[in-house]
Amino acid sequence: MKFVDEAVIKVQAGDGGSGCVSFRREKYIPDGGPDGGDGGDGGSVYLVADASLNTLIDYRFERFYLAERGENGRGRDCTGKGGSDLTLRVPVGTRAVDIDTDEVLGDLTEVGQKLLVAKGGFHGLGNTRFKSSVNRAPRQKTLGTKGEVRELRLELLLLADVGLLGMPNAGKSTFIRAVSRATPKVADYPFTTLVPNLGVVNPRPGQSFVIADIPGLIEGAAEGAGLGIRFLKHLERCRVLLHILDIEPIDGSSPAESARAIVAELEKYSPELAAKPRWLVFNKTDLLLEEELQERVDAIVAELGWEGDVYTMSAATREGTKELAEKLFDFIKSLPDEAAAADPDKEVEFKWDNYHKAQLDDLNPDFDDSDDDDDFDDDDYDVEVIYQR
């Protein structure tokens, strides 16, 4: 199935049902009080994370989704039926962004997690709601409010602990094949990898972490060169980045210049992503003699002014890959728990929050909801006439 990691859809929640104006009319009760019921709330639109999905391709073909409208209220204090909610299934790792405001509504990072993206319209009020000591026969009602409409950008961000970063043909796909059972395509030409790949690494029995391989970056990717930077978003949730460098590029380019170009593209895309822990990994060490290898590594590190972790490996022969995987796992385990370190989600405001409270306060500050329909009688308000001879 084609990998689609971004889609734009329009969602509309259901409108609320309108209230009803009605009066109780039964045998022996000709002048009953108001009994108009409220309308039903409109259905809302939710996103739910589904483990069986791994692409947003379904939302490329159908882009408009409408929840059910609430029914109108009826007499005898019958409340209208609420509209059914609409649930849209998306892959785990999906982020919902409001296109009009650029507000992030939420991230679905766990199976079964549910996110409200469009709130249904509130029900209208029946005339029963407006009775009071001074208004015994109200003929007021309110209409249901409109359901929210949002244009959403759905972004699928892969959930991985380790992200691979580097130029095309640096050996990223070969490395992920060496340490996991993932089988991305490997060939001796640039941009062999066209979509992100995930692999589960088991460095020791009972231990595992997830690694993500994305298409290679080149200088000018932020301006659209190569495959651009659209796949960098898949590294946003990674806890550590492996910057893989080809120590002996076949085109004779400078590894140090390649490393600087990658860092520059990272900073253009997201300073937060560029600030993540990053390890420098020299690949294809089997192409050099041991003495020459160390000299080359020291020279590149000095040219870059690099002060972080430095590792060497040969992904093709798997030399050094197992040790690197074990160190990665130990480093990930030493990091604080993400749930504890994460900032609490911002409150998302929806259109009709607290709508009726203000409406009732304005229209009827002395609202009394006691059930006194049987005591209502127009005769209470007649003028008493006394006949005299």
Curated annotation (Swiss-Prot):
Domain OBG-type G: 160-333
Keyword Methyltransferase assigned: no
One Pfam family cited in the UniProt record for this chain: GTP1_OBG
Residues reported in the UniProt entry to bind Mg(2+): S173, T193
Coiled-coil boundaries: none
CDD domains, alphabetized: Obg (cd01898)
GO MF annotation, one: GTP binding
GO biological processes: ribosome biogenesis
Keyword terms, alphabetized: Cytoplasm, GTP-binding, Hydrolase, Magnesium, Metal-binding, Nucleotide-binding
Gene3D superfamilies per the UniProt record, alphabetical: GTP1/OBG domain, P-loop containing nucleotide triphosphate hydrolases
Residue ranges constituting the Obg domain according to the UniProt record: 1-159
Family stated for the protein in its record: Belongs to the TRAFAC class OBG-HflX-like GTPase superfamily. OBG GTPase family.
Record's protein name: GTPase Obg
Gene source species: Shewanella amazonensis (strain ATCC BAA-1098 / SB2B)
